[in-house]
Regions:
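Conserved alpha/beta enzyme-core scaffold
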Residues: 1-382
Length: 383
């Protein structure tokens, strides 16, 4: 079958199932907006003593699909922690549906070899795991989706999650959770819970893993208690310092800075950079560096942006606080300044991945953008 740009897409992949090529339409006609709510007895308690108990109560079985978010990026402790427990419990043939996998997740290689993980669906992969996969580690191909299309696939049921294991920096005993806390301890704050929000809404079972339990109600919350089944308290869920790594680093590389400066000049000359415009700068040293040059042009021309979208950095926050950007829509906080801003700034709003960029809805935030700057390892010139 051919997709909207004429590229042949297999109709079916053995072990994965039937595929539907993108036909150019932003609206597929079916979105399951209702969260999955399991039946609950009045006497049941959400907090359990450990991960083993949570797994047992979740109903997880061999062959099911488990999901995770990557808001801690290379500082994430949850995926390795949960997979180690599942390996000790003897599970096999699971589908790993993480929103992304980083260098810290190299232990997944061993879990693939042992048979714990049969297949992977994700939006990104780095480090030793990516190299091993590229060299033929798995029998079945990895299914990569964009962050927005992962949100669409979950909402529409193309990606059915049996149990979501979601690390949250704060939660109350009922499961109102967020990426920061207003009750003091922010040692594991990660900011926006944009990727986790979709999993929480649609997974059959949601297990929150936190290192900071607070009193009810934990407001504001990114994940409401109505979407949470079980809660486990652990010593640490992640290291926020790992958020700034790899693609989200601040560059001093002269070549990347030159690329950024040239990109900003193109934007200025495009005619789109006018008062009230909107923009997104993605991950990658050069892409993130564009922001500083846009700021200079905006000050020169007395231009203010209506909103900035996407992975949010301290540079975007500074421009917001300076009055150059009116509002921020945040699906992922790229540094600790962005984390702090989400907690303190009224017009810094966290959004979920489907709201951000789903191809299955007409009103996705990306459709409102005037300017987007993204990075790539390779770009063709003769597609």
């Amino acid at each position: 079958m051919k997709n909207a740009v004429g590229i042949d897409i297999p109709a079916e992949i053995k072990g994965i199932g039937k595929l539907k090529p993108f036909d150019g339409s932003r609206y597929s006609g079916w979105i399951n907006n209702a969260p999955f709510i399991s039946e609950r007895h009045k006497e049941s308690v959400k907090i359990v003593k450990d991960l083993i108990t949570a797994v047992e109560r979740s109903g997880l079985r061999n062959g099911m699909t488990i999901s995770f978010h990557h808001h801690f990026r290379n500082g994430d402790f949850i995926i390795n922690m949960v997979l180690e427990v599942l390996a000790r419990m003897g599970f096999r043939d699971l589908v790993l549906a993480a929103s992304s996998l980083a260098e810290i997740h190299a232990p997944v290689i061993g879990h693939i070899k042992s048979g714990l993980i049969r297949r992977i669906e994700t939006s990104g992969m780095r480090g030793e795991l990516a190299t091993a996969i590229s060299n033929g580690l798995m029998d079945l191909p990895v299914l990569f989706r964009s962050h927005g299309d992962r949100g669409r696939a979950i909402a529409e049921g193309d990606l059915k999650i049996d149990v979501a294991f979601l690390g949250v920096p704060s939660s109350d005993p009922y499961g109102n959770a967020n990426g920061y806390s207003r009750d003091g301890d922010n040692s594991s704050a990660c900011g926006s819970m944009g990727y986790a929000k979709v999993d929480a809404q649609h997974a059959k079972q949601v297990v929150l893993i936190t290192d900071h339990l607070v009193s009810f109600p934990n407001t504001p919350f990114g994940i409401p208690q109505s979407q949470v089944d079980l809660i486990v308290k652990v010593d640490r869920i992640g290291d926020p310092k790992g958020i700034i790594s790899g693609a989200t680093r601040f560059t001093k590389n002269p070549r990347e800075l030159l690329i950024a400066k040239m990109a900003a000049r193109v934007i200025k000359a495009s005619g789109y950079m006018e008062d009230g415009f909107s923009f997104q700068t993605g991950s990658g040293g050069a892409a993130l560096a564009v922001t500083r040059y846009l700021r200079e042009y905006m000050l020169e021309e007395n231009i203010k942006a209506n909103f900035a979208l996407g992975g949010i950095t301290g540079q975007i926050v500074a421009m917001h606080e300076e009055g150059l950007i009116k509002k921020i829509l945040d699906v992922q906080s790229f540094d600790l300044q962005a984390v702090e801003s989400l907690k303190n700034n009224r017009f810094h709003q966290q959004i979920d991945a489907a709201y951000y960029a789903s191809s299955g809805i007409e009103g996705a935030a990306v459709n409102q953008l005037d300017v987007v700057v993204l990075s790539a390892l390779e770009i063709d010139t003769g597609f």
